[in-house]
């Protein structure tokens, strides 16, 4: 498993499992909203009134509507008022 996947998959899985509403910002500035239905190595399936398959290489930022705990013993990821994700409890 690549090092970049060690946080990405648990984060997306927590959002999917808990059905947390998210705002997904694309690299071209477009904002998509919905819940994560599924994901794999290359795409995220985002559900709102319709399902959209969004390629991960087009995603800039994923902002959850509320705090989410990532993995066992992991930290909380929360969204702030500036639409940026913050990590409160990650060891460095």
UniProtKB/Swiss-Prot annotation:
GO biological process terms, semicolon-separated: regulation of DNA-templated transcription; regulation of RNA stability; regulation of translation, ncRNA-mediated
Keywords noted in UniProt: RNA-binding, Stress response
PROSITE patterns: SM
GO molecular function, one term: RNA binding
Domain Sm, chain residue ranges per copy: 9-68
Keyword RNA-binding belongs to the record: yes
Region (Disordered): 72-92
SUPFAM superfamilies: Sm-like ribonucleoproteins (SSF50182)
One Pfam match: Hfq
Subunit text: Homohexamer.
Function: RNA chaperone that binds small regulatory RNA (sRNAs) and mRNAs to facilitate mRNA translational regulation in response to envelope stress, environmental stress and changes in metabolite concentrations. Also binds with high specificity to tRNAs.
Protein name per its UniProtKB record: RNA-binding protein Hfq
Gene field: hfq
């Amino acid at each position: 498993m690549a090092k970049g996947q060690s946080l990405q998959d648990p984060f997306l899985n927590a959002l999917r499992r808990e059905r947390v509403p998210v705002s997904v910002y694309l690299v071209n500035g477009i904002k998509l909203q919905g819940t994560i239905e599924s994901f794999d190595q290359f795409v995220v399936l985002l559900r709102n009134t319709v399902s959209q398959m969004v390629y991960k290489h087009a995603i800039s930022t994923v902002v959850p509507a509320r705090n989410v705990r990532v993995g066992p013993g992991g930290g909380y990821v929360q969204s702030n008022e500036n639409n940026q994700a913050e990590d409160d409890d990650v060891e460095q």
